[in-house]
Amino acid sequence: MAFTAAYRRLLAGTSLTCLTLGLLAGCAMPVPAQSVSLLEPADGATVGTTFKVRFGVKGMAVAPAGEIMTDSGHNHLLINQMPVAKGESVPFDDQHKHFGAGQTETMITLPPGQYKLTSQFANGAHQSYGAPMSATIQVTVK
């Protein structure tokens, strides 16, 4: 009889511990991080004068320009430029390529040389999400 009571207490304690740990694990689930990346070309790659650029976005939706929604936006490719400060509009010029239709890849043509390419994510009004939503790589165009 003593063995049975002790066994029940052990089983009850173990069950409570497992339940508590399970609940804590569920509460500790991380929120998906928001980030951007340049999936192609690879950092340090040597490419031809016309090459593919693929954008990666995590934790936000890609949507066309003009659509103002929380946690959404579209890609911009900055050529030899620093990330655009949070809240500032991404300029419209040859060094700031806009992909306002929601494109996630494109072909670009650059003359031979060394380039810094930065993916910059911005909202539907072209207002930058800042450096945390940018990624920069170096490429050599031959």
Give residue spans per PLM region.
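Short, compositionally biased P/S/T/A/G/V-rich stretches that sit at domain boundaries
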Residues: 29-48
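C-terminal motif of bacterial Sec signal peptides marking the signal peptidase cleavage site
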Residues: 24-26
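Bacterial N-terminal signal peptides that target proteins for export
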Residues: 2-17
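Poly-acidic low-complexity segments
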Residues: 2-4, 30, 80
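Long, low-complexity serine/threonine/glycine- and acidic-rich segments characteristic of extracellular
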Residues: 44, 50-58, 63-142
